[in-house]
Amino acid sequence: MLKWALIFFVISIIAGFFGFSGVSAATATIARVLFGIALVIFLIFLVLALMAGQAVL
């Protein structure tokens, strides 16, 4: 489960880079939405992994 949390974290960082660097207006909007969604999913999976008692990293 922690693997998925890290995958969504990387996706959110990449989407955030494109969304906040001023690539284009349409791309920026889509990237900002994906950044938010991936960040929320990352946090959910991180909390679930910690609650399950799995080792972090």
Swiss-Prot record:
It is found in: Cell membrane. GO terms for cellular component: plasma membrane. The keyword Transmembrane applies. The keyword Transit peptide does not apply. It is a multi-pass membrane protein. The chain crosses the membrane at residues 4-24, 33-53. Belongs to the UPF0391 family. This is UPF0391 membrane protein RHECIAT_CH0003936. It comes from Rhizobium etli (strain CIAT 652).
